[in-house]
């Protein structure tokens, strides 16, 4: 399913729609505009007043997390029960039984489907949010980068929902703008990046949704897959979703070994978990450095130096 703004962009850039299965008509209303403005204003206040920093960070968390819940697939929810040998056979015969794992000689973990599932989440909210994010990233690449910069002067390394890591043939983006398009770029720059003519404008636009800003600058990057990359330079920056950064010795070689050997790497997680009225310590080995990247077409050359 495509939202109409994204579909219009696809058609404008040459994609031909040959079949339409269903159309859902709606009346566009900016129902969350006040909430978005409130979050942006609170974050701006947190930038200028140290006493309001915690409010800015709290609103950042709210803005980044509130739409994700609406995309939850409740049909995949399961009920987990722990039982002994005497009760496991009764659970297996239950029509809602899905699978059983033996934890030790006397304890079994049984997974059951829920008897009733209430599908009451507004899925269209998550659909619009994520597809608008997709539209912003497409516009940034094709309408800005690919228009104003020669493809020999930049190369995308990895991309996420709201960020893109790329290599440039110069020290800054302005230096690789096509000479014949520099005047046009300066006149349209404010549509993509925060204004730089005055400090107060830059501070205000820093928290304006839809504008891009430089998040990191370094010497290189090892990008394995989504949320698994290592940037190195004056100050290193890395991401390893699902792996505890404090418990594992993570450096450039951790990612390079996966890239060169084509074998996923593991990490260790340790912590406490509450089960019923008991607190248990756990030690988990997890494959957090994956080599496989199936979401996008990747370059045949693993290394580009």
Which positions does each model-derived feature cover?
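Conserved acidic
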Residues: 1-305
């Amino acid at each position: 399913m495509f939202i109409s703004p994204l579909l219009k962009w696809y058609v404008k850039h040459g994609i031909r729609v040959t079949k339409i299965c269903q159309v859902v008509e709606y009346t566009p209303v900016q129902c969350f505009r006040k909430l978005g403005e409130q979050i942006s204003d609170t974050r701006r206040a947190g930038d200028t007043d140290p006493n309001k920093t915690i409010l800015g960070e709290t609103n950042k968390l709210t803005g980044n997390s509130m739409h994700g819940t609406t995309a939850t697939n409740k049909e995949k929810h399961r009920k987990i029960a722990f039982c002994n040998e005497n009760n496991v056979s009764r659970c297996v015969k239950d029509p809602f039984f899905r699978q059983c794992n033996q934890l030790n000689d006397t304890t079994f973990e049984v997974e059951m489907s829920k008897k009733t599932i209430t599908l009451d989440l507004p899925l269209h909210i998550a659909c619009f949010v994520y597809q608008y994010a997709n539209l912003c990233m497409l516009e940034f690449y094709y309408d800005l980068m690919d228009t104003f910069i020669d493809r020999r002067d930049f190369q995308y390394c990895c991309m996420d929902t709201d960020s893109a890591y790329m290599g440039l043939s110069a020290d800054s983006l302005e230096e690789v703008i096509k000479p014949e398009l520099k005047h046009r770029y300066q006149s349209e720059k404010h549509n993509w990046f925060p204004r730089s003519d005055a400090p107060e404008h830059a501070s205000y636009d820093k928290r304006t949704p839809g504008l891009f800003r430089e998040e990191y600058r370094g010497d290189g990057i090892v990008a394995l897959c989504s949320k698994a990359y290592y940037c190195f330079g004056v100050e290193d920056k890395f991401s390893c979703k699902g792996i505890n950064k404090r418990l594992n010795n993570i450096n450039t070689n951790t990612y390079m070994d996966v890239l060169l050997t084509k074998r996923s790497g593991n990490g260790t997680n340790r912590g406490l978990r509450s089960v019923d009225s008991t607190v248990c310590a756990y030690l988990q080995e997890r494959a957090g450095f994956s080599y496989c990247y199936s979401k996008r077409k990747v370059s045949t050359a693993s290394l580009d130096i």
